């Protein structure tokens, strides 16, 4: 009986792990262990409940069902087979279950890079142990090549005149959905308006066509991407656990929004989902933002059409209308503002359609991408008609490559997937926009430069001002090297930036 119990337990683990791997792949694509751990440890408030139901229906219940059927079948055989044959069958089944479980564990490790994650956790990096740079005049200073990390607390940032900022995180918008002529992989461009905006304004690219930021450790899911763009640092899994225990989100970091708060900017975040999800409220409210308009507050403030709500919250078509009303209020004041918006319609696994979505592409997801492109373009046109536009810089950034795995199967393995970026009405120009290697961490200093700020040394965190002549950290040191180093432990970061207790 004990052997049967152990065998059934291992069988359950085996099948459950198999279904978990399949479920994660279908819903989130090729994620690594950092993303999984952060999601599990983060506050769950605001999570799409359909994901939880999907996990139960497609992973837990099938595994339990197979184990129950197997147990019943074993009982059936137990009554009909003699002792020797039954014993041999049990041993054979046990060997099969244990061996396949081991193979499953090895596969899971290779897929999520678990052993490497644990190995890196036990190693220490020195890329954050910076030395003080010699003081030089801003006009003469081009950066100290021996320093990789620059703590924004120590950096001088000045401006004679700076713009307002509208910063839009575009959910899952990557360049592969453009046509091949413009740097994507599609026969027909799913992002025609965003493509045109990128051509007419400033868009940094990893190729000689349109392109963008490389996916990078600690930046490839929404809250991680937001953190990287605000702090110039990748997000560590430990932050999720710290939020639960200490209610803190990188308290020692000086973010883009912390700096703008010091400059007197009014700062607001508008999202269609709930602000508590993954600690979004803590990241923004603890770092200079005055208020957050989320699903709960927006539905109390404004009237809306009932069809414009999805499983996460408000559809983007409704969110852009809310944004126009709030920007009209902000624009009527004498204060400079930073208005941040985050879209949701292109969220995995299938996106969310609205009444504005076309039906001209080959699948729903491509239609939603096209819809997003059109809506963003219309919103930008509306902004350009407002009195405050001449003093406002608009930044569009895809938060991470899409996780909707079923819609990206046609992407060649040789194609480098990158996220979209576009700087509109920048106060600074550059011709060095093609064949760049950069990550979301570079958005921090680059955004400030686009607004009209001068950054002493052109580096903040691990980010480099792309408008400067300096190479980014991955251009100088290589993507693989920096990718490995940021996964290692750092006492400097833990004590000074994350301030773990």
Regions flagged by a language model, labelled:
Residues 146-501:
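Solvent-exposed soluble domains appended to multi-pass membrane proteins
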Residues 1-124:
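Transmembrane and membrane-interface helices of multi-pass
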Residues 35-36, 84, 137, 193, ...:
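Exposed alpha-helical structural elements
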């Amino acid at each position: 009986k004990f052997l049967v119990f152990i065998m059934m337990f291992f069988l359950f683990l085996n099948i459950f792990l198999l279904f978990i791997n399949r479920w994660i792949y279908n819903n989130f694509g090729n994620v690594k262990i950092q993303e999984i751990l952060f999601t599990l440890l983060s506050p769950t408030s605001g999570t799409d409940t359909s994901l939880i139901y999907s996990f139960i229906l497609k992973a837990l219940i099938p595994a339990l069902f197979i184990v129950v059927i197997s147990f019943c079948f074993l009982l059936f055989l137990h009554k009909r087979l003699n002792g020797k044959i039954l014993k041999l069958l049990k041993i054979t089944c046990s060997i099969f279950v244990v061996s396949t479980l081991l193979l499953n564990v090895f596969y899971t490790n290779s897929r999520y890079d678990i052993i490497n994650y644990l190995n890196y956790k036990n190693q220490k990096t020195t890329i954050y142990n910076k030395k003080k740079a010699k003081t030089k005049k801003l006009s003469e200073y081009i950066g100290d090549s021996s320093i990789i990390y620059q703590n924004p607390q120590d950096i001088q940032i000045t401006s004679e005149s700076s713009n307002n900022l509208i910063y839009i995180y575009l959910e899952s918008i990557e360049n592969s959905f453009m046509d091949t002529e413009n740097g994507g992989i599609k026969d027909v461009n799913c992002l025609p308006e965003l493509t045109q905006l990128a051509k007419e304004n400033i868009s940094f690219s990893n190729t000689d066509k349109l392109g963008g930021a490389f996916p990078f450790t600690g930046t490839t899911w929404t809250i991680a991407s937001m953190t990287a763009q605000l702090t110039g640092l990748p997000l560590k899994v430990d932050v999720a656990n710290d939020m639960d225990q200490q209610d803190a989100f990188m308290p020692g970091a000086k973010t883009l929004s912390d700096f703008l708060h010091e400059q007197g900017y009014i700062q607001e975040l508008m999202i269609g989902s709930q602000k508590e999800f993954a600690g979004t409220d803590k990241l923004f409210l603890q770092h200079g933002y005055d208020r957050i308009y989320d699903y709960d507050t927006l539905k109390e403030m404004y009237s809306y059409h009932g069809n414009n709500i999805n499983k996460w919250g408000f559809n983007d078509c409704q969110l852009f209308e809310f944004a126009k009303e709030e920007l009209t209020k902000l624009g009527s004041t004498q204060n400079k503002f930073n208005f941040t918006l985050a879209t949701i319609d292109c969220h995995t696994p299938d996106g969310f359609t609205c009444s504005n979505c076309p039906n001209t592409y080959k699948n729903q997801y491509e239609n939603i991408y096209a819809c997003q492109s059109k809506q963003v373009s219309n919103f930008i046109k509306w902004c350009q008609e407002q009195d405050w536009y001449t003093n406002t810089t608009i930044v569009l950034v895809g938060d991470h490559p899409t996780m909707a795995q079923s819609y990206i199967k046609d992407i060649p393995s040789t194609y480098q997937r990158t996220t979209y970026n576009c700087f509109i009405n920048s106060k600074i120009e550059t011709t060095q926009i093609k064949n760049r290697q950069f990550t979301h961490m570079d958005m921090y200093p680059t955004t400030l430069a686009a607004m009209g700020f001068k950054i002493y040394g052109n580096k903040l965190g691990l980010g480099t001002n792309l408008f400067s002549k300096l190479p980014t950290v991955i251009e100088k040191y290589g993507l693989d090297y920096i990718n490995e180093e940021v996964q290692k432990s750092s006492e400097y970061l833990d004590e000074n930036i994350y301030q773990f207790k």
